[in-house]
Amino acid sequence: RKYMGDFDFFKKPHPLDFEWRNTKKSVDYLSDLVLQSNHLDDEILVLGMPTLFANLCRRDISQKVTIVERNHAVVDCLKELSHDNCQVIVGDIFKSDPEMLGMYATVVMDPPWYEPHFYQFIWLASRCLKLGGRLIISIPPFNTRPGIDKERIAWFDFCQKQGLCLESLSPKKLEYSMPFFEWNATRSAGALTSPFWRHGDLAVFQKLNMHFVDRPEYEEENVDWHEVEIKGCRIRIKINDAEVDETGYNLDLEPLVATQIL
């Protein structure tokens, strides 16, 4: 709660969801940016930023805001905040049909910082943008990992092929709260660091033409995870139905490395 501000009603992020949430400061900045750049009757699409959607819902804004979200734990929280101008669509961004989502004046997205996710998010966002609309993206800054400079060039090239022109790029403009699982791991390792050490660059694109390319191919592994929550700690277990019967299943946990933390 100390670091999540008004967003502590969400369950703790789980590593499998690739979920790093912006701080309240960054969410307020993004909310102001979105509202100032849109007319009162514009529609806004949010991809992968539930805290931004929650913040906009709480402001009781005039613009209509829609979020596409597949994480059911997040969806349950967001539905408590949704109202006439704030709509939650339960769906997978990797599979969502842009024609079913409609067209928007602004799309704001914060995809996981991995290549396949970026291409899928950008493709869907571009297909849902009106001509002249804006795409606002959080991207990993330089030195995030080896080769990130080449990855960014490839992403920007993909944006250009979608008719998107880079309007502005602000280094380390956004900050993130350290998720509990990361904080727990650093604490166990004896490392002391700021809970806001992670930053993202903010890129703004404008849709200048309606060029489109085919949706990038991506096959996501279909895994059946069973989640158990113990005193706020979310544990997921991969289940093979063929190996589980009605008599139950004994589970033993053994650490793979010293100081391993759940």
Q: Where do the protein language model's features map onto the residues?
A:
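Short alpha-helix
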Residues: I148-L169
